[in-house]
């Protein structure tokens, strides 16, 4: 089966990405690549779980919106079905649940049913297969969990149930019942479903995947208020307990393999940590079936739900709805094919790095010694070694290490302080010297100043004014002939540090200002006299030239008139003059 390049379902709004690395910390498989401080999702590694979307404090991570695709489908297909995932009972208010079918029909859908219809069929098939196998089988309803096994736990692929998810089961049912040209739109809380719909072997079954958030936006844009919609029955409703699928243990209860925590025939895992640790369990206690859900507490906590409700309130809504009378005809057993195939597809060939390569990067970040490897996790990785491996594989940057960047900042600060030609001194609130650069030591003709009161070297009054809050910034000349000090002092408090800073800019020695001013005046007078002489000489030469030019011109005109008169004589018809 060919493995195609995956289409990204999650991307990054770079304008909002702020170097917090939270997405790196929460991503269960570290599918976030950081380049020049910008975090982006590597589609080959991504599970589409949407954890980064839900957790990003700046809203920089976003999943792909497919509303235009759904709208186009309604315009181009004669028949389009809407499949509503069972988590809708937790995503919407109880009074709105039976109004959703009418709202979806107003949007243009011809068939509206619960995806739990397909969940019931998958659960029944799962129970039958689980009883025939010795090793525990893994449910395949959660596409993020399936993707994790295929990409990162390939040894467990044989344990995956060879069954499609409820979404795909329902899609096959609709296509079989209404024809292959029927459109099928799935609406749920899961972002990973968008990627599942594009699996090559399942292409064409699900035409579009929307989240509950997208549905809410669509209804708002079309001016459809659920409060103004009538209650209406679904075209098909599920049998049994299939409405429990979106909560932890729901699929197992539907399959009849677990009715409570005392049952040992199945294991429900929700949240990545439980999923990671529990998928490889053996036959201990007679476990036949493992239900993995990537989102903690199940699909009612998916990233596509826009709800302020407490997660336990959502769960309670689902439980109550599962016990409510069914509103619509119950779906019969399907004749659609429920089989599926899964295969290992690691995101990329494993990259091996030598211990020397790892050691070099550790040393570059100041963590060459084991005691300097803090394993603080601020960068998003569990250990310094994991971060180094990510750096070497091109997924991370050295600058993501917060302790390393702090040391770099301190070193730059120290370098600036030591190379500054101005005297710089840092004081505590008691006006004792914490740090002073070489330029300040030269200014006060002393060394080894740390711990000494500033009053031993300069007048402390400016610093006392700043420390007491009398002035926020002191900026004035500071002269002390007895100490040989001549400088301009700029003193100010350091925010959030409870410290004071003083910068001494050297001034000319007393009397030097007057000497410089006198020298400048003398030079100015001299230059003015030279300019005056040049201007007078230029004027004289110009006048002389102009006079010579005028005299020569006058002589030339007289000669010209005389020549014309001597040659022409009196003109014809003219009156003679005496």
Q: How would you describe each model-predicted region?
A:
Residues 64-363, 382-390:
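Iron-sulfur-associated redox domains of electron-transfer enzymes in respiratory
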Residues 2-4, 9-12, 18-42, 47, ...:
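Iron-sulfur cluster-binding cysteine motifs and their immediate structural context
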Residues 520-578:
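Signal-transducing coiled-coil/dimerization helices and immediately adjacent hinge/linker segments
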């Amino acid at each position: 089966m060919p493995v195609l390049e995956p289409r990204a379902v999650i991307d990054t709004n770079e304008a909002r990405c702020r170097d917090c690395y939270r997405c790196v910390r929460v991503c269960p498989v570290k599918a976030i690549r950081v380049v020049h401080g910008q975090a982006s999702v590597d589609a080959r590694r991504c599970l589409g779980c949407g954890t980064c979307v839900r957790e990003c404090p700046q809203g920089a991570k976003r999943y792909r919106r497919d509303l235009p695709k759904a709208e186009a489908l309604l315009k181009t297909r004669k028949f389009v079905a809407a499949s509503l995932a069972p988590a809708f009972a937790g995503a919407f208010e109880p009074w709105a649940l039976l109004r959703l079918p009418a709202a979806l029909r107003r949007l243009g859908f011809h068939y509206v049913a619960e995806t739990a219809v397909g969940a019931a069929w998958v659960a029944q098939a799962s129970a039958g297969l689980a009883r025939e196998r010795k090793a525990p089988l893994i449910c395949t309803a959660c596409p993020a969990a399936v993707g994790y096994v295929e990409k990162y736990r390939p040894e467990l692929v044989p344990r995956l149930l060879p069954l499609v998810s409820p979404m795909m089961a329902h899609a096959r049912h609709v296509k079989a019942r209404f024809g292959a040209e029927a459109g099928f739109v799935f609406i749920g809380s899961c972002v990973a479903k968008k990627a599942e719909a594009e699996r090559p072997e399942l292409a064409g079954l699900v035409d579009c995947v929307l989240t509950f958030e997208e549905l809410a936006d669509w209804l708002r844009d079309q001016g459809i208020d659920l409060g103004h919609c009538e209650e209406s029955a679904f075209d098909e409703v599920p049998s049994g307990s299939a409405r429990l699928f979106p909560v932890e243990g729901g699929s197992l209860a539907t399959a009849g393999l677990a009715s409570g925590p005392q049952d040992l025939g199945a294991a429900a895992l929700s949240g990545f940590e439980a999923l990671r640790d529990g998928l490889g369990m053996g036959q201990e206690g007679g476990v036949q079936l493992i239900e993995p859900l990537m989102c903690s507490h199940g699909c009612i906590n998916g990233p596509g739900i826009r709800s302020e409700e407490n997660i336990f309130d959502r769960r309670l809504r689902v439980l109550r709805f599962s016990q409510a009378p069914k509103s619509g005809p119950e779906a019969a057993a399907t004749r659609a094919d429920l089989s599926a195939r899964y295969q290992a597809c690691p995101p990329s060939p494993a990259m091996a790095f030598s211990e020397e390569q790892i050691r070099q990067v550790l040393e570059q970040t100041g963590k060459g010694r084991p005691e300097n490897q803090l394993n603080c996790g601020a960068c998003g990785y569990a250990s310094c070694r994991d971060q180094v491996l990510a750096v070497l594989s091109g997924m991370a940057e050295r600058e993501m290490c917060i302790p390393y960047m702090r040391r770099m900042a301190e070193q730059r600060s120290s370098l600036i302080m030591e190379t500054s030609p101005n005297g710089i001194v840092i004081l505590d609130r008691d006006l004792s010297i914490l740090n002073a650069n070489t330029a300040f030591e030269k200014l006060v003709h002393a060394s080894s100043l740390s711990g000494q009161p500033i009053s031993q070297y300069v007048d402390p009054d400016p610093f006392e004014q700043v420390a007491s809050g009398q002035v926020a910034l002191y900026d004035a000349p500071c002269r002390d002939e007895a100490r040989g000090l001549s400088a301009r002092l700029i003193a100010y408090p350091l925010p959030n540090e409870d410290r004071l800073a003083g910068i001494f800019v050297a001034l000319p020695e007393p009397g030097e200002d007057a000497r410089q001013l006198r020298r400048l005046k003398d030079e100015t007078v001299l230059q003015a006299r030279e300019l005056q002489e040049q201007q007078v000489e230029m004027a004289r030469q110009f006048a002389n030239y102009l006079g010579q030019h005028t005299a020569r011109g006058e002589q030339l005109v007289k000669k010209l008139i005389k020549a014309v008169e001597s040659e022409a004589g009196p003109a014809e018809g003219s009156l003679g003059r005496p």
